[in-house]
Amino acid sequence: MTVYLTAEQVLFIHYRLVSETGGEHGVRDIGLLESAIARPRATFDRHDLYPSNFEKAAALMESLVNNHPFVDGNKRTGIACTVLFLMQNGVTFSATNPELETFTLRVASSKIKHPQIVKWLENHSRF
């Protein structure tokens, strides 16, 4: 069974990251935040739109990074929540901090799409 992040967890992660690394606190659009958190759970006709946990993680990251629900720290929050989501679901992440930074910037610039995000997450994970 998949363990999903709650809004409270995402808000806490965002608060801690901005407090520790700088930037402005705050939610810019609560609807975008709720949408980003809900996206990994999306279904159609009772079938998951994102069947694997890597697909769910990619959906979460893509939404948090690109929808800009926060005033600041969207990329930091997006990658941190993605890693936490995978860890909560039994995956060990093996990417280095420089790799995470480069990857997150590529996601933010829309240079890679959902299938490539999934593949990157799979290639940088261990079970």
Predicted regions and their residues:
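FIC/Doc superfamily catalytic core
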Residues: 1-127
